[in-house]
Amino acid sequence: MASQEIEALSGALARLPGLGPRSARRAVLWLIKRRETALPQLLNALTQVQELLVECGVCGNVDTSNPCGICTDHRRDQRSICVVEEVADLWALDRARLFTGKYHVLGGRLSALEGVRPEDLTIGSLLDRVAQGGIDEVVLAMNATLEGQTTAHYIAERLEGAAVRVTQLAHGLPVGGELDYLDEGTLAQALRARRPVG
């Protein structure tokens, strides 16, 4: 039987996304075996996160400064905003280095089942950013889920009448994906979004 301290650490780790109780116990055992090297590094990294990281008051990104490095980077396209559900989505898109504008993190997506309403997200501050002017395009980069598409549709409706072009990421076949393994919804979306070759 493990001590209370080990159980407490396992329980804390098990609350992290993607880690269940068994994975958390394995992580704790790994840390115990390497307590002289790995544990101090982990403690230092966690302390740094707690002390230094803040949420950007403009876009919702997590950074060491407010506004964040993306919002203050004048080399980025000031006239386009890419709207994402979560910070992880922002990071994924920015790693691809294809979008060079600014971002806006909603902090989730609309969901009747989970009781998430427009006022629970940062849609209002997005509309304020667009209303201030200087924005030519809003790219809706929501996940290809029912809730994500509902959120995108809601935002597009709210932006009707604004002098801004609203676009959405294309959905369809993943690179390397085999048709045989794809669901009907993905295949249907890929067919609808088809474009000429050449």
Swiss-Prot record:
SMART domains: TOPRIM. CDD domains: TOPRIM_recR. Gene3D superfamilies: 3.40.1360.10, 6.10.250.240, RecR Domain 1. It holds the Pfam family RecR_HhH. GO terms for molecular function: DNA binding; zinc ion binding. Residues 79-174 form the Toprim domain. A zinc finger (C4-type) spans 56-71. Keywords: DNA damage, DNA recombination, DNA repair, Metal-binding, Zinc, Zinc-finger. Belongs to the RecR family. May play a role in DNA repair. It seems to be involved in an RecBC-independent recombinational process of DNA repair. It may act with RecF and RecO. This is Recombination protein RecR.
